[in-house]
């Protein structure tokens, strides 16, 4: 292949979009006719407001003293305040004065080893040489690097399947990475639980060798997870179809308070011999939301391809952001490499997940006490930060406009935003919303 052909192929496989000179000239001419200053950017459309962060922005602008924010997935303590974990605070004290030099392109080696070990545990023993891990910009960055790798090195036309519903950014990441995404059944609004039959049917109907994004635990936004028995059936079907798991690991330890229990599905796939991807985030379980700390791990059947895979991942990282940030990864490394700090972290995870479970029960009790129409048991049956309430869009509008309780239009509520001071107010609002829309 000639140099020109190589460049052409590289451009074809990238997200490069050539400038349309005709449209550009039309834009300039239009501006000149209207008397406006000419600009190349007149045809740039206004993008939609992010469905999650847009609600948070509206909350911050609201001056009503009763307002409650249950939109953004960030932990809050009983007083509704952001919480810095004690283990993180101690690690930060140890890191005072640490140098601010560039990290290697693939991040801190010890951080990468500890991240893979945290997720895969003893399941990775004997498989380490078939795994490659790189530090990434939290879960979003890990997903983005992984999806780009899929576009470049999996068979052309490989489709990435995402649960219906899912975290809204999953489809955005695929689109901006030049990869086609589709949906598979997941949530049953009638039972407010898992549509397991629909999920399995969609996996069987998907083309062989498709990629399935699977939430490790604490499914976002529904809070509905498969049982261990169901995970084993999912693995059976994916093996039959040669599908590739891509685990989105945002809540390990935060869901149940047990790091090993929450990692069951990832370790199952590894033990069953899958080639697979995993994207880890330390935003929730370490409270490092703004530090953008995460990791991407890819598992291969063969050791000899790992150096080549790492070289390509590093090329993509270099072109995207050159090298990852230091502070968050150093914090995680400091905690996970110190037995005392690790024990403190595990204790704090149990406390955070325990508070969320307590909020679930108190919300259910408050709704039952008010005799709110309907069955609300799903609130305690779901797991993790979110509950998929089942509220309709008109009911959500009442909560937002009348009660200044901010949540997503889908009815997803971040339970971290509720506490003993506002649960009764929240339940009163739901009673009004449900009864007034019947």
From Swiss-Prot:
A GO term (biological process) for this protein? aspartate metabolic process
What are the alphabetically sorted keywords of the record?
Aminotransferase, Cytoplasm, Pyridoxal phosphate, Transferase
> Which cysteine pairs are covalently linked by disulfides here?
none
Question: N6-(pyridoxal phosphate)lysine occurs at which residues?
Answer: 284
One function term, GO molecular function aspect: L-aspartate:2-oxoglutarate aminotransferase activity
- Give the protein's cofactors: pyridoxal 5'-phosphate
Specify the species: Dictyostelium discoideum (Social amoeba)
Q: Any idea what job this protein has?
A: Plays a key role in amino acid metabolism.
**Signal peptide start-end:** none
- Could you tell me the gene encoding this protein? aatB
Q: Which domain of life is it from?
A: Eukaryota
Quick one: which residues bind L-aspartate? Answer: 73, 167, 220, 412
Family affiliation: Belongs to the class-I pyridoxal-phosphate-dependent aminotransferase family.
Reaction(s) catalysed by this chain, per the record, are: L-aspartate + 2-oxoglutarate = oxaloacetate + L-glutamate
Tell me where in or outside the cell this protein is found.
Answer: Cytoplasm
Can you supply one Gene Ontology CC term for this chain's record?
cytoplasm
Documented EC number(s): 2.6.1.1
Q: Specify the protein name.
A: Aspartate aminotransferase, cytoplasmic
Q: Which CDD domains does the entry link to?
A: AAT_like
EC category:
transferase
The misc remark on file is: In eukaryotes there are cytoplasmic, mitochondrial and chloroplastic isozymes.
Q: Does the keyword Transferase apply?
A: yes
Q: How does it assemble?
A: Homodimer.
Membrane-crossing residue ranges in chain numbering: none
């Amino acid at each position: 292949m000639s140099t020109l052909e190589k460049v052409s192929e590289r451009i074809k496989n990238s997200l490069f979009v050539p400038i349309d000179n005709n449209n550009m000239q039309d834009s300039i001419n239009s501006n000149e006719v209207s008397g406006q200053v000419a600009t190349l950017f007149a045809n740039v459309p206004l993008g939609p407001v992010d469905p999650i962060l847009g609600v948070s922005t509206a909350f911050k602008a609201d001056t009503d003293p009763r307002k409650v924010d249950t939109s953004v997935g960030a932990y809050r303590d009983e007083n509704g305040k952001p919480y810095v974990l004690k283990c993180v605070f101690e690690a930060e004290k140890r890191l005072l004065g640490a140098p601010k030099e560039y990290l290697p392109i693939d991040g801190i080696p010890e951080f990468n080893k500890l991240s893979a070990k945290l997720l895969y545990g003893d399941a990775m023993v004997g498989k380490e040489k078939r795994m490659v891990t790189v530090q990434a910009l939290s879960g979003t960055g890990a997903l983005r690097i992984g999806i780009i790798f899929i576009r470049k090195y999996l068979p052309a036309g490989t489709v990435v399947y995402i649960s219906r519903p899912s975290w809204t950014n999953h489809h955005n990441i695929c689109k901006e990475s030049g990869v086609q995404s589709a949906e598979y059944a997941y949530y049953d609004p009638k039972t407010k639980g898992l549509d397991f039959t629909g999920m399995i049917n969609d996996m069987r109907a998907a083309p062989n060798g498709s990629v399935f994004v699977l939430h490790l635990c604490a499914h976002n936004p529904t809070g509905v997870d498969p049982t261990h028995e169901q995970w084993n059936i999912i693995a059976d079907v994916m093996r039959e179809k040669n599908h590739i798991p891509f685990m989105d690991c945002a809540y390990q330890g935060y869901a149940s308070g047990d790091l090993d229990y929450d990692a069951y599905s990832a370790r199952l796939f590894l033990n069953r011999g899958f080639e697979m991807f995993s994207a880890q985030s330390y935003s929730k379980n370490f409270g490092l939301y703004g530090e953008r700390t995460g990791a991407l791990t890819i598992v291969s059947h063969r050791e000899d391809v790992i150096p080549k895979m790492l070289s390509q991942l590093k090329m993509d990282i270099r072109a995207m952001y050159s090298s990852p940030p230091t502070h968050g990864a150093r914090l995680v490394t400091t905690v996970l490499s110190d037995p005392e700090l690790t024990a403190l972290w595990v204790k704090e995870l149990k406390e955070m997940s325990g508070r969320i479970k307590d909020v679930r029960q108190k919300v259910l009790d408050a709704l039952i006490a008010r005799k709110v129409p309907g069955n609300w048991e799903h609130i305690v049956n779901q797991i993790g930060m979110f509950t998929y309430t089942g509220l309709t869009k008109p009911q959500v509008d009442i909560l937002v406009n009348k009660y200044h309780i901010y949540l997503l239009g889908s009815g997803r509520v971040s339970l971290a935003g509720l506490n003993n001071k506002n649960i009764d107010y929240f339940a009163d609002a739901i009673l009004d919303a449900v009864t007034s829309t019947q």
